[in-house]
């Protein structure tokens, strides 16, 4: 598989945090960057928005977020960003006019320079308002684009009607350029990043580990295979059980972290499948946990067996940052973040037997090989997939667009 042989970890790079040039923004002050997303709930898009708000402020800009609100509002405002609660999650076009006027009023009030949309409904609502004010527009495409129907193609395509488009992986970029023309020259890939300070094995204390173990009642003497994922079929819970059924001779307990929060039809199907495969007592469904670094810390192997390609997949990054062996199928964004047999394994897509072989290899690693992989994984993430790198590259996109506009207005 090409992704197994072509991956390179590269040399260590030193990223100096970029700063905005004040003269490139309107009024000679630090630029005002307005990010717009549906809600501030727990998720990768939302975390990335807060991380970017922090980076904008650190670069000398003003960070503003428009969303429908959510449990992360306090975390956002605590970093110094300004939040405006507007229902930009609304998908009913009949309501967009009123919401658009609200957004336009905020953009004028905040004296915005750049509008950065992170989802489709907000793009339909906010981009016309931004363009009517002559503002720079940016979008980040976080998800797969489904373009089979004509209407869906038009709906998704709104995300590409900006001055610059950011794709979170080469995989997402390929989906965009395969379906839409005239985008590539204003399209760049900025991989999602992981907070290497939060996901640092050296900083996870023993009390945190004990609390985690007690909360989900984990044994101490059995290797743990962990799948942290939403209770959704495409995340690969069933194919992981099939893979584990082929290596029953090895000691392990599989923990489906977050799966217990699914509907009864989902959890019943997983339990029934496991019992049918002879894995009764060898797997456990638990609720999601807040302390993911501690959860990763107790895992011996982290698996991300998504049967549909992930646009990117933060779980793989977080596991590698924690120095944990990670296994995923060799497709989608996972193929870009995992270096096969150096920081983890890439199994043949949707092949339960090959997935099982990879898990067995991880479980049977010698202490020395595990130590080498732990170091390589951590270095790989620090060099190529840190939050600091993601934010720096995005700030540079903003700065280029501001400079280009300033030059055009001279």
PLM regions: where:
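Short hydrophobic beta-strand element within catalytic cores of glycosyltransferases
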Residues: 65, 325-328, 338
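Conserved acidic donor-binding segment of nucleotide-sugar-dependent glycosyltransferases
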Residues: 340-341, 345-353, 361-367
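A conserved mid-protein helix/loop that constitutes part of the nucleotide-sugar donor-binding site
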Residues: 43-54, 223-246, 268, 353
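A short, well-ordered alpha-helix in the C-terminal region of glycosyltransferases
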Residues: 223, 354, 361, 368-384, ...
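N-terminal strand-loop element at the rim of the active site
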Residues: 20, 28-31, 35-94, 262
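Short His-centered aromatic/hydrophobic patch
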Residues: 117-123, 141
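A conserved, positively charged/aromatic
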Residues: 137-168, 174, 181-182
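A conserved nucleotide-sugar
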Residues: 60-62, 215-224, 237, 241-284, ...
């Amino acid at each position: 598989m090409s992704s197994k042989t072509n991956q390179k970890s590269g040399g260590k790079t030193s990223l100096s945090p970029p700063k905005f040039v004040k003269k490139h923004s309107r009024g000679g002050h630090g630029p005002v960057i307005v990010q717009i997303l549906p809600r501030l709930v727990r998720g990768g898009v939302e975390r990335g928005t807060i991380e970017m708000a922090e980076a904008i402020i650190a670069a000398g800009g003003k960070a503003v977020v428009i969303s429908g609100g959510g449990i992360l509002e306090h975390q956002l405002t605590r970093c110094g960003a300004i939040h405006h609660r507007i229902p930009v999650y609304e998908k009913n076009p009949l309501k967009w006019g009123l919401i658009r006027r609200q957004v336009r009023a905020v953009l004028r009030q905040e004296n915005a320079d750049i509008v950065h949309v992170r989802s489709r409904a907000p793009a339909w609502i906010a981009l016309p308002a931004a363009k009517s004010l002559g503002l720079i527009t940016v979008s980040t495409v976080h998800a797969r684009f489904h373009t089979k129907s004509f209407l869906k193609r038009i709906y998704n395509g709104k995300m590409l009607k900006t001055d610059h488009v950011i794709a979170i992986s080469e995989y997402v970029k390929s989906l965009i350029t395969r379906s839409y023309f005239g985008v590539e020259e204003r399209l760049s890939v900025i991989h999602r990043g992981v907070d290497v300070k939060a996901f640092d094995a050296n900083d996870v204390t023993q009390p945190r580990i004990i609390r985690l173990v007690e909360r989900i009642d984990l044994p101490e003497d059995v290797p743990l295979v962990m799948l942290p994922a939403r209770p959704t079929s495409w995340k690969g819970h069933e194919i992981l059980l099939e893979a584990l059924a082929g290596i029953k001779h090895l000691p392990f307990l599989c923990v489906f972290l977050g799966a217990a929060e699914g509907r009864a039809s989902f959890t019943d199907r997983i339990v029934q499948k496991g019992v049918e495969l002879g894995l009764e007592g060898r797997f456990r469904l638990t609720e999601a946990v807040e302390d993911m670094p501690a959860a990763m810390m107790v895992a011996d192997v982290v698996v991300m067996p998504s049967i549909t390609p992930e646009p990117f997949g933060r779980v793989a990054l977080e596991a590698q940052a924690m120095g944990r062996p990670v296994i995923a199928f060799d497709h989608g964004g996972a193929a870009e973040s995992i270096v096969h047999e150096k920081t983890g394994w890439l199994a043949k897509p949707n092949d339960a037997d090959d997935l099982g072989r990879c898990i067995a290899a991880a479980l049977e690693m010698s202490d020395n090989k595990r130590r080498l992989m732990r170091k390589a994984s951590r270095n790989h993430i620090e060099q190529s997939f840190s939050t600091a790198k993601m934010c720096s590259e995005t700030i540079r996109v903003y700065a280029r667009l501001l400079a280009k506009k300033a030059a055009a207005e001279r």
